[in-house]
Amino acid sequence: MALRVPALVLVLVLGAGRAAAGQGGGWETVREELGDAARDLVHVWVAPFRLGGDDLASLVILGEAFAIAALNDEAIRAWVEGNGHTPAVKAIRLFEEPRRVHRLGLTRHLIGLSAGLYVAGLATGSGDLREAGLGCAVSNLATTIPRSIVARTVGRLRPRYRRGAFVFEPWVGWRSWAYRSFPVGHGANSMACAAFLVERFDLGVAEPAVYLLATGIGLARVTKGAHWASDAVAGLAWGWAVGRGVGGRFLERAEAEGTLAGQAAEAHAAPRLYVGLRVEF
């Protein structure tokens, strides 16, 4: 991932630039939007330092959910292995590798799709397509970079090696995939993009489907034996928080631009002539 992500980001920038070259002001649009994207990354990464009392309840709920999952990791794993015939497990396994849908949890595929949306938005002049592509890319990068560092540093052993739920070898994850269980990656990546889209756009009846897709991708890593249930809880929650944060930033800018555009239109409106008639008796 260390080499793939920078390469894909470079493809995004170069592809956007090529599409922008044929449009007046295109390069300026790309420059401004990539600048906003960089600031969004920093904003998300320093978010833990802005936590206050209002966030305490959410943190407690998340902590309790993670603790419950962690204490039952081995029981959940045993139940999944012994109940593969149940409708619930069968449904989750529809998102497992090697089915193609699991690729929506991979950074390289999400960045590729994001680049395609962004370039298409530039080529067609669609701001919504550009925001969807860029926002998904930013949400994914803001999620996957720190998550990858945490996974490699914590060094939790994956369940498929059957040595128990609490086998940790700090730093070993930097050289061994087996010790990168916490937190889940596929689910965090897909959930970040899903949460961004839901926060930024009005998806209507599609909103539950988007969240269901991301959750299914995350849980499928549990049924696959690549992650513990608590890994999925942590990863999905992390992706959701990041995606909402990035989506909120995009939404604020869109609302501000809409307000300015409305004020400008009002200021440049054509003068109006009013004719009144008054009759006195």
Task: Indicate residue ranges for each PLM-predicted region.
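N-terminal secretory signal peptides that target proteins for export/translocation
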Residues: M1-L3
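N-terminal targeting leaders of membrane proteins
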Residues: A7-T124, R152-T153, P159-R180, N189-A192, ...
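Interfacial segments of alpha-helical transmembrane regions
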Residues: D54, S58-V60, A120-P146
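Short, aromatic-rich membrane-interface segments at the entry and exit
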Residues: D55-A57, T107-R108, L129-E131, V205-P208, ...
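Alpha-helical transmembrane segments of multipass membrane proteins
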Residues: A65, A69, A142-R147, A151, ...
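Membrane-water interface at transmembrane helix exits
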Residues: R77, E81, A120-G121, R147-G155, ...
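Small-polar-interrupted transmembrane alpha-helices in polytopic inner-membrane proteins
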Residues: S114, V138-A151, A206-R221
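Membrane-embedded catalytic cores of phosphoryl/pyrophosphoryl-handling enzymes
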Residues: Y161-E280
